[in-house]
Design a protein with these regions (language model features):
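Class I S-adenosyl-L-methionine-dependent methyltransferase catalytic core
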Residues: 1-177
Length: 177
């Protein structure tokens, strides 16, 4: 598949409260919504019930992973997206689902990790149990993001990484699958 082409249309939430609901996807260069099969495998690994967990979707793009987490009961989902049009589409999808546990942050992922954008009433620590790290391909952003994540993670947090190049996993990280 040529990921450099624009992707537009819709994708479906595959499980949980919002199952079968459509998420509109903006036509943006490099936007790669995570395919159904990959999301299904990922959420089989994470578990179907994410109740009580805080999730961070860096480089949210279509929001497929963050909305899937919200659908499966995550108490808080923060989606960070730099692209103005993609972030606006995330807001429209959040409103259409009435996903009040989802917060959209339009901004740079590295800046988000460096500052505290948390909304009032969120966990004071601003830490996350699950992080989805799926930056645009050919940006080699994964190593830098992994270096900035530890202060924002709960003990035993899980980080899902999607990359177009192999990622070296070094301490304090452990590769699970």
């Amino acid at each position: 598949m040529n990921y450099s082409k624009r992707t537009a249309g819709a994708l479906r939430v595959i499980g949980g409260k919002y199952r079968s609901r459509l998420l509109r996807v903006s036509a943006r260069p490099g936007l790669r919504p995570t395919p159904d099969r990959v999301r299904e495998t990922l959420f089989n690994w994470l578990g179907q019930d994410l109740s009580g967990l805080a999730c961070l979707d860096l480089f949210a793009g279509s929001g497929a992973l963050g909305f899937e987490a919200a659908s499966r009961g995550a108490m808080r989902v923060v989606m960070v997206e730099k692209d103005r049009a993609a972030a606006a589409q995330l807001e429209r999808n959040r409103a259409a689902l009435d996903a009040t546990q989802v917060t959209i942050v339009r901004g740079d992922a590295a800046a988000f990790l460096a500052r505290d954008y948390e909304r009032p009433g969120a966990r004071p620590s601003g830490r996350f149990d699950v992080v989805f790290l799926d930056p645009p391909f050919r940006q080699n952003a994964v190593p830098a993001m992994l270096g900035k994540l530890p202060p924002r993670l709960q003990p035993n947090a899980r980080v899902y990484v999607e990359s177009d190049v192999p990622v070296e996993v070094a301490a304090p990280w452990a590769e699970l699958e």
